[in-house]
Amino acid sequence: MDFSIIQYSKFMTLLAMSLQNLKTLHMSLEESIKWLGEVMAEIGPTHSQKSEDWNIFDVKQANAIIDYLKISLFQHYKLYEFMFYSAREEIVIGTEQVIEVVKSACGPFPNPLEEGISFDIYSTFIEPPTILDTEMKRLDQEQGPEESQPETDTSDMDPLVGFTIEDVKSVLDQVTDDILIGIQTEINEKLQIQEEAFNARIEKLKKA
């Protein structure tokens, strides 16, 4: 059935009113059928003020609307009543997750939530100072600048003072020779092992 835009609007209004009567006014099936008959009876050749909102449908269209309401709303009226009136149990579907974290320790490793921080930043700004570090700082402050001055002077001294260039060269030559001799010995041992393995394979091939 082809309807115009205004007819579609009125038809949707009729459907909404039918559901509203069931949901709000708690009309029974007999009362809803009676109400629909009264509304459809207003569709006719008379053009009174009361029926001017519904007289846009002819008799054929009105019969099509009634047939549709029979197979949709009225046929499943009990189902609509159950949907509007019956209280339904709310089923909440959820899940529980148990997360076990590592217990904090006094070691050098940060807690699990702080593993993304570099160790330098963690040890400087987050990790509390240990008892040993606190005692060392306190002893350094008690000793004063007089005792720390010779250490500073000693650390500033050149470790090569008292050695000539020839002494340094001789030491470097000796260290280099020792390293090269060790490498050469290791290479010779590996070559000897490979040679023995090849000889053993050749002997097996000869016997075969």
UniProtKB/Swiss-Prot annotation:
InterPro entries: CLAMP. It comes from Homo sapiens (Human). The keyword Nucleus does not apply. Calcium-binding protein. May be involved in the control of sperm flagellar movement. PANTHER family: CILIARY-ASSOCIATED CALCIUM-BINDING COILED-COIL PROTEIN 1, COILED-COIL DOMAIN-CONTAINING PROTEIN 189. This is Ciliary-associated calcium-binding coiled-coil protein 1. Residues 139-159 are annotated as: Disordered. GO terms for molecular function: calcium ion binding. Residues 143-156 have a biased composition (Acidic residues). It is found in: Cytoplasm; Cytoplasm, Cytoskeleton, Microtubule organizing center, Centrosome; Cell projection, Cilium, Flagellum. GO terms for cellular component: centrosome; cytoplasm; sperm flagellum. Keywords: Calcium, Cell projection, Cilium, Cytoplasm, Cytoskeleton, Flagellum, Metal-binding.
